């Protein structure tokens, strides 16, 4: 009997009371934690009443605060902005769904909280900075040598494969970029900011919610035609791979070289047999030439203009995990404004979103820093036609919402 009591006391120890509340209250709180529900006062206490000194940054979906739970675990608490128009029940249902997404290379959502008009998400706290804070800083990029970069590429591929094919719902991220990749204490990459579009209703414009993605990473069919599929994430991944290999940011490269993008530059060198010139020279000494060439080829295949010509993340993961045999040659990369033969059948799991509005890269981070860049907004449809556009987008999305790469799960955007 004593052992049983000690076991029970150990369970409730993290919830030790500061006042004489009933034992039933503690049991209810334990049960709530099992269901990933965090009491508001626990989060208030953990973040010191959301004190400015605990603020990690401000992302497109609201501020993020660092906190510490009574059991000693560090957390990142995202307070969703009031732009979210979802009711409590809808928010809870979506949060429960996202909380089921568990993978080594995806930032884990530990739970959620609703309090009045406040809606909060509780994530694991990732110690190191986002990838862009390391990769694009001249005094820091050498901290991640080629071996680490290759492992980061492989980890991101596995995380995306999970979101696309193995998660409870097929999740299209829509904003894969260096700022949304967090690195833990062992430099293991974790995809952040996934599934956030599900927490916002369709009647909120893309400009306000920043769910359309980030300039320089978006697939051309998504930018120009509003066609969204898992292949849009594949394109963004390809851009990120080329950035990791070269140590250069696509958007910054275009500013220095107005006549071409990082993708076009890499493609030209690849076709000339000068692939190793693409490599970041700061890490050349640690690089494996065969791995570099493989990553460049995979990156270029992922950024093909025709989404049907891009590999799936499953194939990418397989190519990275073993020495490939024959790997097809990539064509010229796709960029917004480029042309490809549009097929009558959309890519698997594609949904038309109508006319898109694109924004810059304000990032929601759950680690030690937050990246908040601003890009150029592209105005969407006139106000008079927005309603019909949303209606068409909703119908189109609904027609494909039950399909995914395996045709088994609902799609999440």
Swiss-Prot record:
The active site is at 175 (proton acceptor). Residues 348-368 have a biased composition (Low complexity). The modification Phosphothreonine is found at residue 214. It is an enzyme of class 2 (transferase). Pfam families: PK_Tyr_Ser-Thr (PF07714). Its EC number is 2.7.11.1. Gene3D superfamilies: Phosphorylase Kinase, domain 1 (3.30.200.20), Transferase(Phosphotransferase) domain 1 (1.10.510.10). SUPFAM superfamilies: Protein kinase-like (PK-like). Keywords: ATP-binding, Kinase, Nucleotide-binding, Phosphoprotein, Serine/threonine-protein kinase, Transferase. One of its GO terms (molecular function) is protein serine/threonine kinase activity. The keyword Cell inner membrane does not apply. The gene is CRK43. ATP binds at residues 56-64, 78. The modification Phosphotyrosine is found at residues 123, 222. It catalyses: L-seryl-[protein] + ATP = O-phospho-L-seryl-[protein] + ADP + H(+); L-threonyl-[protein] + ATP = O-phospho-L-threonyl-[protein] + ADP + H(+). SMART domains: S_TKc. This is Cysteine-rich receptor-like protein kinase 43. It comes from Arabidopsis thaliana. The lineage of its organism: Eukaryota, Viridiplantae, Streptophyta, Embryophyta, Tracheophyta. Residues 50-335 form the Protein kinase domain.
């Amino acid at each position: 009997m004593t052992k049983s009591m000690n076991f029970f006391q150990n369970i409730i120890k993290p919830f030790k009371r500061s006042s004489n509340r009933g034992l039933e209250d503690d049991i209810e709180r334990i049960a709530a934690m099992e269901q990933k529900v965090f009491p508001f006062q626990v989060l208030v206490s953990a973040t010191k009443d959301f004190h400015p000194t605990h603020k990690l940054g401000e992302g497109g979906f609201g501020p993020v605060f660092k906190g510490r739970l009574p059991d000693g675990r560090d957390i990142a608490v995202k307070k969703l902005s009031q732009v979210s128009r979802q009711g409590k029940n809808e928010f809870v249902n979506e949060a429960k769904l996202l909380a089921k997404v568990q993978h080594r290379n995806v930032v884990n959502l530990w739970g959620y909280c609703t309090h009045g008009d406040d809606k909060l998400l509780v994530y694991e706290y990732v110690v190191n900075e986002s990838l862009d804070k390391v990769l694009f800083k001249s005094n820091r990029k050498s901290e991640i040598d080629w071996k680490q970069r290759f492992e980061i590429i492989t980890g991101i591929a596995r995380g995306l494969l999970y979101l696309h094919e193995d998660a409870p719902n097929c999740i299209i991220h829509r904003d894969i970029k260096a700022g949304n990749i967090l690195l833990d204490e062992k430099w293991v990459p974790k995809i952040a900011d996934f599934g956030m579009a599900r927490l916002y209703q369709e009647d909120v414009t893309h400009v306000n919610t920043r769910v359309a993605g980030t300039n320089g990473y978006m697939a051309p069919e998504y930018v120009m035609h509003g066609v969204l599929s898992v292949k849009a994430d594949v394109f963004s991944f390809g851009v990120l791979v080329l950035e990791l290999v070269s140590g250069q940011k696509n958007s910054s490269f275009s500013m220095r070289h107005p006549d071409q993008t990082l993708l076009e530059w890499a493609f030209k060198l690849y076709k000339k047999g000068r692939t190793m010139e693409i490599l970041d020279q700061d890490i050349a000494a640690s690089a494996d030439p065969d791995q570099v060439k493989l990553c460049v080829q995979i990156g270029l295949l992922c950024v093909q203009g025709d989404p049907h010509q891009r590999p799936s993340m499953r194939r990418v993961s397989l190519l990275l995990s073993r020495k490939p045999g024959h790997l097809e040659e990539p064509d010229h990369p796709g960029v917004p404004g480029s042309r490809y033969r549009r097929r009558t059948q959309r890519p698997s799991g594609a949904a038309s979103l109508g006319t898109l509005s694109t924004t810059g890269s304000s990032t929601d981070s759950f680690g030690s820093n937050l990246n908040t860049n601003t890009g150029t907004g592209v105005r969407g449809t006139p106000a008079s036609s927005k309603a019909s556009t949303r209606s068409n987008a909703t119908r189109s999305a609904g027609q494909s919402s039950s399909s995914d790469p395996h045709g088994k799960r609902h799609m999440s955007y």
